[in-house]
C-alpha cells in the first residue's frame, strides 16, 4: 500500500517539483501518492478570494476559515482514516529524523496545510490541526517549501525508494550521529588525496574509519548530539583517537 501524503496549498504548481528525482521515482513506483488541494476551489467570494484583513488591525492578510476548512474536510475524506493534519509554521515543533522514520515505517498518512500571507485563521489551528511542524527558527513566505522538504525526507526513508538499501541508513541523524565523509574518483586531484584506508579494500578497517569519522564530525559540528546517545566503549575509544588526531588532548 502506498504512503499517502497531501498538501493544502494556494500554489499547487510549486509542489510539482516533488515529481522529479528520488521522490518522482518513488511516485512512479507506487511507493507514495501525492495529492494537492487548493482552498480557492472552495471559496464563495468574488475572484476566489481566500484571505481577508485581520480583526484588530495590523499589516497583511489572513487566510480565511471557510475555504480552508472545506479544503481540509474534502482532503481528509479522500485520505486514510489515520491521516494526521499538519500545519507548517515557525511556531511548530522542529521535527527530527526519527520522527519522520516512524512515519515512513508506519505509513502514516499526512495532510500538510501550507499557509500564506500573515498566516491562517487561528480557529483552523485550534480545531482542525493535529500538529504544527517547523523546519527551524526562521520564516518562509509560505508552507509549500517546508511541505516539500518533509515529503522528500519521508520518502527517502521508505524501503525501495533509494537505489541502495544502505543509502538512507548511512544518512546523518539516522543513528544519532552525522554521516562520515565520502570520496569518489580520482584518488588524487590538485594534490588532495583520498584517505588510504578507503583504497585498501579491508572492509573491517573501512567500517572502523567511517565510524570514527562519524563520531568525530559530530563532535566537531554538533556536540549536542553526542549528549543524547549512549556511546559504547569502542565508540569512546574511536572518538578519543579522533580528538587526538585533530589536536585535542591525547
UniProtKB/Swiss-Prot annotation:
It holds the Pfam family tRNA_m1G_MT. One of its GO terms (molecular function) is tRNA (guanine(37)-N1)-methyltransferase activity. It comes from the Bacteria. It is found in: Cytoplasm. S-adenosyl-L-methionine binds at residues 115, 135-140. Keywords: Cytoplasm, Methyltransferase, S-adenosyl-L-methionine, Transferase, tRNA processing. Its EC number is 2.1.1.228. It catalyses: guanosine(37) in tRNA + S-adenosyl-L-methionine = N(1)-methylguanosine(37) in tRNA + S-adenosyl-L-homocysteine + H(+). GO terms for cellular component: cytosol. InterPro entries: Alpha/beta_knot_MTases, tRNA_m1G_MeTrfase_C_sf, tRNA_m1G_MeTrfase_TrmD, tRNA_m1G_MTases_N, tRNA_MeTrfase_TRMD/TRM10. GO terms for biological process: tRNA N1-guanine methylation. Coiled coil: none annotated. Belongs to the RNA methyltransferase TrmD family. Specifically methylates guanosine-37 in various tRNAs. Homodimer. This is tRNA (guanine-N(1)-)-methyltransferase. It comes from Legionella pneumophila (strain Paris). The gene is trmD.
Amino acid at each position: 500500500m502506498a504512503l499517502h501524503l497531501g498538501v493544502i496549498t494556494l500554489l499547487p504548481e510549486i509542489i510539482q517539483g516533488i515529481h522529479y528525482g528520488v521522490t518522482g521515482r518513488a511516485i512512479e513506483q507506487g511507493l507514495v501518492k501525492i495529492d494537492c488541494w487548493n482552498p480557492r476551489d472552495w471559496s464563495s467570494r468574488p475572484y476566489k478570494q481566500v484571505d481577508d484583513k485581520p480583526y484588530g488591525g495590523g499589516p497583511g492578510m489572513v487566510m480565511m476559515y471557510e475555504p480552508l476548512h472545506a479544503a481540509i474536510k474534502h482532503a481528509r475524506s479522500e485520505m486514510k482514516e489515520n491521516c494526521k493534519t499538519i500545519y507548517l509554521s515557525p511556531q511548530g515543533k522542529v521535527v527530527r529524523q526519527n520522527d519522520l522514520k516512524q512515519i515512513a515505517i508506519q505509513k502514516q498518512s499526512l495532510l500538510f496545510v501550507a499557509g500564506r500571507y500573515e498566516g491562517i485563521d487561528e480557529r483552523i489551528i485550534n480545531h482542525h490541526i493535529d500538529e504544527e511542524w517547523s523546519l527551524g527558527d526562521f520564516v518562509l513566505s509560505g508552507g509549500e517549501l517546508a511541505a516539500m522538504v518533509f515529503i522528500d525526507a519521508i520518502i527517502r526513508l521508505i524501503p525501495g525508494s533509494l537505489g541502495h538499501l544502505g543509502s538512507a541508513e548511512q544518512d546523518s541523524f539516522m543513528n544519532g550521529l552525522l554521516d562520515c565523509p565520502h570520496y569518489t574518483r580520482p584518488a588524487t586531484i590538485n594534490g588532495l588525496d583520498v584517505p588510504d584506508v578507503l583504497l585498501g579494500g579491508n572492509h573491517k578497517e573501512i567500517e572502523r574509519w567511517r565510524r570514527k569519522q562519524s563520531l568525530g564530525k559530530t563532535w566537531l559540528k554538533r556536540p549536542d548530539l553526542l549528549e543524547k546517545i549512549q556511546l559504547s566503549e569502542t565508540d569512546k575509544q574511536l572518538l578519543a583517537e579522533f580528538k587526538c588526531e585533530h589536536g585535542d588532548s591525547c
